[in-house]
Amino acid sequence: MVPPTAVAEGSAVAIKDPVKDTILTPRFYTTDFEAMAAMDLQPNEAELEAICEEFRKDYNRHHFVRNEEFEGAADKLDPETRKVFIEFLEQSCTSEFSGFLLYKELSRRIKAKNPLLAECFAHMARDEARHAGFLNKSMSDFGMQLDLGFLTANKDYTFFKPKFIFYATYLSEKIGYWRYIAIYRHLEKNPDSKIFPIFNFFENWCQDENRHGDFFDALMKAQPDTVRGPIAKLWCRFFLLAVFATMYVRDVARKEFYEALGLDARTYDKMVIEKTNETSARVFPVVLDVNNDKFWTRLERLVANNAALDKADASDAIAPVKLLRKLPFWIGNGAEMAKLFLMPAIDSDRFQPAVR
């Protein structure tokens, strides 16, 4: 079901074609619902119940209400800023809507067997639907919206085992918190760089992301095998690296958006990665050594390879020639990711003992 707040309104709004799926675009996920329903929450049930009680309060129930500041705001943007801002809205809306679909389906499918877990997912689905609808409404200020019903039916869904859903969504929610709060604080100090009134909502908005991340933190502690043992350490390293590398490459590629806000994409991402890495030490057994200069050097090589891949894609060459041109950069990306993964990780007990 598409949330009512996210449905296009008015005949003057055009439906925007979704962007082509790439490794950098938001994914849609599904999982093993029976395994989720059968999960024993007893090892950390008290904390999960406390988090659910926080969700029930719905602190942002009345927060996402548009005001007169939105009127005519879209018309004030120059064409280039308008273009990169619409891209930001689309990516963000798709990501939030992806979360809504996953959480809503989980709440529906596990309700009979695991009511506490189902209720938590229902509350998070409510939040994600609200976010997606608010973003899509902002897109309508630019004369277009996403057809979220079409996305629901036509997007490819990636299957993840429950523990992989936990790792990926925990990081997505926590990184979302740090991204939103960093932009909000920057614009609070630099109001002339606030290109659109949606950024006024980011302070409360990011608290939804933070609470969702806390839920997955508590859920992993209720399933201790997800964060204990050598295999769990490897998976935590993998997901940290995958999420950080994807964000860094994507954001540097669209650095013009951050420049429009008066931010440097690399500096911004470095701060977000450092903060998310530090936060992750509260639940993950290991985190990445993001203070190692080699970490950033190798991310920059991924950026360069990705730019070369984009250039090859944009050329007029025939498909076989494009493939041959792209092959060295795919191999290069694989090699750099392997080097990043093999860098020594940091044990979380040593990294952040006070928090743990």
Curated annotation (Swiss-Prot):
Source organism, top-level taxon: Bacteria
Family designation: Belongs to the AcsF family.
Purpose of the protein: Catalyzes the formation of the isocyclic ring in chlorophyll biosynthesis. Mediates the cyclase reaction, which results in the formation of divinylprotochlorophyllide (Pchlide) characteristic of all chlorophylls from magnesium-protoporphyrin IX 13-monomethyl ester (MgPMME).
Named cofactor requirement(s): Fe cation
Source organism per UniProt: Synechococcus sp. (strain CC9605)
Any one biological process term the GO annotation gives: light-independent chlorophyll biosynthetic process
Catalytic reaction equation(s): Mg-protoporphyrin IX 13-monomethyl ester + 3 NADPH + 3 O2 + 2 H(+) = 3,8-divinyl protochlorophyllide a + 3 NADP(+) + 5 H2O
GO MF entries: iron ion binding; magnesium-protoporphyrin IX monomethyl ester (oxidative) cyclase activity
Record-linked HAMAP family: AcsF
Keywords on record: Chlorophyll biosynthesis, Iron, Metal-binding, NADP, Oxidoreductase, Photosynthesis
Protein name: Magnesium-protoporphyrin IX monomethyl ester [oxidative] cyclase
Spans traversing the lipid bilayer: none
Its EC number(s): 1.14.13.81
Enzyme class, UniProt record, top EC level: oxidoreductase
Protein's pathway: Porphyrin-containing compound metabolism; chlorophyll biosynthesis (light-independent)
